């Protein structure tokens, strides 16, 4: 992007994580790992049985983590959208009420995570914490195109650069995404990767 005020992190807040998060996908692809993940002394690639174990363990606890991230987004949006409803309320009560559907029911609960959840009050993520999960969905979906066309397919890489990276905030994130994927975002790839589907 030639205009710095439209590039880098100067894009829609729920689109800013897509470029960085999509890169993480290559670190889980055998074809990519074989290019750089090698033994320091022998130069051998990661043994297939070990890589298989890593892949199998990738989703350990994924459903719990998924729900935890959703709960963070939920409480963040709830408190910012309906602030007046929570003024002078006990923080533990608000936590239990708003997040009941996101937790395993327990007779004893710990202290509210709201006491330490600084993202919802500072750092630019106020009412924007959902963007982490949204970006995860976008990058998993966008990577599905790389996976289907070849993770090192030069044409797909150029298309990603042309449609997403080089455009910055010159057009809406939704338009840029549709330019690359030729459709709206679909959560299926993220749910598959997490082992939920």
Label each residue range with its predicted role.
Residues 1-197:
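Cation-handling catalytic/transport regions enriched in His/Asp/Glu
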């Amino acid at each position: 992007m030639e205009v710095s005020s439209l590039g880098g992190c100067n894009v829609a807040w729920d689109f800013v994580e897509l470029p960085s998060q999509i890169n993480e996908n290559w670190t889980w692809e055998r074809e990519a790992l074989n290019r750089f993940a090698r033994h320091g002394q022998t130069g051998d690639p990661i043994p297939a049985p070990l890589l298989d174990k890593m892949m199998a363990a990738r989703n350990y606890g994924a459903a719990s983590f998924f729900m935890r991230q959703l709960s963070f987004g939920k409480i963040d949006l709830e408190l910012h959208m309906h602030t007046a409803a929570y003024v002078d309320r006990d923080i533990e009560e608000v936590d239990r009420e708003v997040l009941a559907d996101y937790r395993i029911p327990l007779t004893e609960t710990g202290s509210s995570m709201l006491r330490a959840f600084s993202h919802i009050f500072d750092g630019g993520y106020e009412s924007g914490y959902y963007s982490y999960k949204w970006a995860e969905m976008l990058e998993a979906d966008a990577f599905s195109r790389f996976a289907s066309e070849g993770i090192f397919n030069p044409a797909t890489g150029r298309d990603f650069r042309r449609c997403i990276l080089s455009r910055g905030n010159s057009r809406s994130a939704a338009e840029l995404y549709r330019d690359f994927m030729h459709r709206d975002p679909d959560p299926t790839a993220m749910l598959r990767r997490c082992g939920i589907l």
